[in-house]
Amino acid sequence: MRAAAHRNQRTFRKIGWLLVALLLSAGAWAMPQVTAIGPDLYAYISDNDGSANSTFLVGSKGILVVDTGVDATEGSKVLQEIRKVSQLPVLYVINTHYHPDHQGGNSVVGPNAAIISTDFTRERTLALMQSSPQLHLQAADVTFDQKIKIHLEPYLAEVYFPGKAHTSGDALVYFPRQHAIAMGDLFLNRSSPAMDDGSVENWVKALDQTLALPLDKVVPGHFELATKVELQRFRDYLSDLFTQVRSLYRSDVKVQDAVRRIHVEKYADFRQYPKYQATFADNAEVIYQQLQQQ
């Protein structure tokens, strides 16, 4: 019970910092990077670290968007870039998970779109809508348990739940024709991730499954567009840290000492965000807590 309470406090603190990011992002109108990563598929790399990347696919009759940014301002930036490519309506919005920085722009990007997420993401979003109405979130209209296919002619998007990983209800969006994937926060390019009520052990397995796909481009939840090379390194970081912490845990090393004894020198270029509990030490502590619950 104590570990669960501590985990929930961590989650609420992280969401609190996301609210701070929401406020800080208002009025920030720098230039994002938009890159074609396959036939009619585009990666939108946000210029705001507090707002997620997006991906959009243009079909013959409409557009599919993955993640919409932290708020209406960031959502407007996403929509502005979409409109440089196509004037077709946004038919589908997919939210990779419930954190506000990935879905705060839903109502701007796709006011008439069908919003799609896992069942878990919808439940958590509804709870946030009650506790934090100032976020103006919009929960999914369509939910799924394991997998859903979206036919946006002439293309296909495969949306699936890889198991508990970053959260307990993440969604990955694979575009088979384009050999590309939008990963939400299951992958951050050269950064320690924030860890929610998920499973790092399964997270590594999910990344292994992703790496087995035919992939040319990988859109991370935040930071630069990537390939399998960067995804492999992020996977290796999580696996390495998990192995180290598990060894210390099995040797009855206390959590405070375990956090101090990890070796992460080869990941020195990874970004660290203490305010989001997204540091090497934070990651090690969460892994330790997850091992305690097994």
Task: Annotate the PLM regions.
Residues A3-L18:
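Bacterial N-terminal signal peptides that target proteins for export
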Residues S60-L64, T73-I116:
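Active-site metal-binding motif and surrounding structural segment of the metallo-beta-lactamase
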Residues S25-G27:
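N-terminal signal peptide c-region/cleavage motif recognized by signal peptidases
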Residues G62-L64, T68-A72, K149, L156, ...:
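Metallo-beta-lactamase
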Residues D40, L57, D67, I82, ...:
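Divalent metal-coordination and catalytic microenvironments
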Residues V34-Q80, V173-F175, A180-M183:
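Conserved beta-strand hairpin/beta-sheet module of binuclear metal-dependent hydrolase folds
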Residues I116-D141:
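Acidic/polar short surface loop at catalytic or gating sites that assists cofactor/ion binding
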Residues L19, A212-P214, L225-Q294:
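Accessory terminal helices/loops
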